[in-house]
């Protein structure tokens, strides 16, 4: 058995192979790419003829080099860069480092402390596609918020009443209206019927368009502050550019959402996930993508809670004890469970009871929601492990049994 450390980068990778005694038996660099990966595999086979004879340590989970070695059947283990930094001090206190030395540190850390590191596993086809799509959606939503904020700032400067005409700046009717009439002077002269036709063109129904047109016309007739002429002349071009960006983002979001629906439909955990309170068609794909279809890759529910960030971190020394918020986790799973908990306390009896109990004891809103999220994680782990959908009646009856026997 040999242990291999890979200090990876975008352009090249440093390898170090150590034997079971910690002796460095081979070190080399390869360029990033298929040819380089195959060279590395060929050199490793001289010391580990079978992939089962080698353990590999690396500081990334998402990379082509990870995909390559997982596909060949190697056992890959992820080390957090913070962990590697601590292991580096075990060998050198001077702080000196190099790519080759870091590769050796990774290999030796895996040799001595393998039990501390999580083994990486290739995601199933459904989860991998969903992960790419849901993360793409997340990025588009962030871009949408950024563009909306820029639009808000621009309109406040020269056309503030536009912010009061619609419920938000990410609506088709807003884009259609402001592209056609980007200044107050142009919009003020519009009749109710003209505004109505613009809103209809944007896709609003006859009744809604008529009601909105009257409201918009009324607000446009109110006295407004007059900005400098140069400001009014310059800003419309910037606003139109932002509006076109917003339209592009909305179109991309629609396309990505359709692909998410198509790929999520066949995911093996879809029905199980959506049986839980608070988890529906929006949060389900995120959890399916980030957790994968095989829940057994988490050793137990405690490991899953740490992964999701719902379990706190305890610092204890002598008389000192402090419970802290867990920051090292999968933020997407944490956010999904936070939103699911918010939904669950409005629709699920036990979730509401738990939330109200903790709030009455003086616990904060966030602390109470995390307690609900912890319960959801326990249920999620159980139903995915047993392949049985969640049943609220069964859950409540089991709680009654446990409270009676305890």
Label for each model-derived stretch:
Residues 1-406:
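A detector of single, family-specific signature residues
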């Amino acid at each position: 058995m040999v242990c291999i450390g890979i200090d990876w980068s975008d352009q090249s990778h440093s390898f170090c192979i150590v034997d079971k005694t910690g002796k460095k038996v081979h070190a080399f660099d390869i360029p990033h790419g298929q040819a380089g990966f195959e060279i590395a595999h060929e050199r490793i086979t001289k010391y580990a003829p079978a992939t089962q004879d080698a353990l590999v340590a690396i500081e990334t989970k998402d990379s082509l080099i990870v995909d390559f070695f997982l596909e060949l059947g190697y056992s890959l283990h992820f080390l957090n860069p913070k962990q590697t930094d601590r292991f580096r001090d075990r060998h050198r206190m001077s702080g000196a480092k190099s790519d080759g030395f870091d590769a050796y540190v990774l290999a030796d850390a895996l040799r001595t402390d393998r039990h501390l590191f999580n083994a990486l596993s290739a995601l199933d086809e459904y989860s991998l596609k969903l992960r790419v799509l849901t993360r793409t959606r997340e990025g588009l939503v962030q871009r949408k918020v950024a563009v909306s904020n820029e639009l808000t700032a621009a309109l406040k400067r020269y056309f503030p009443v536009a912010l009061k005409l619609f419920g938000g700046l990410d609506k088709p009717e807003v884009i259609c209206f402001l592209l056609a009439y980007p200044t107050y002077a142009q919009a003020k002269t519009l009749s109710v019927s003209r505004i109505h036709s613009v809103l209809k063109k944007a896709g609003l129904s006859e009744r809604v368009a008529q009601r909105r047109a009257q409201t918009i016309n009324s607000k446009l007739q109110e006295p407004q502050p007059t900005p400098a002429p140069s400001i009014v002349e310059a800003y419309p071009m910037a606003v139109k550019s932002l509006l076109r960006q917003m339209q592009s983002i909305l179109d991309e979001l629609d396309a990505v959402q359709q692909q998410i629906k198509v790929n999520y439909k066949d995911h093996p955990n879809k029905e199980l996930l959506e049986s839980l309170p608070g988890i529906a068609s929006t949060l389900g794909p995120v959890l399916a993508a980030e957790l994968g279809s095989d829940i057994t890759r988490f050793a137990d529910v405690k490991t899953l809670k740490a992964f999701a960030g719902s379990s706190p971190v305890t610092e204890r020394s002598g008389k000192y004890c402090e419970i802290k918020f867990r920051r090292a986790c999968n933020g997407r799973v944490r956010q999904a469970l936070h939103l699911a908990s918010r939904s669950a306390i409005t629709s699920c009896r036990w979730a509401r009871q738990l939330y109200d109990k903790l709030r009455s004891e003086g616990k904060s809103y966030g602390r109470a929601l995390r307690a609900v999220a912890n319960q959801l994680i326990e249920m999620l782990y159980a139903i995915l492990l047993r392949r049985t959908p969640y049943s609220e009646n069964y859950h409540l009856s089991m709680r009654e049994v446990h409270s009676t026997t305890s």
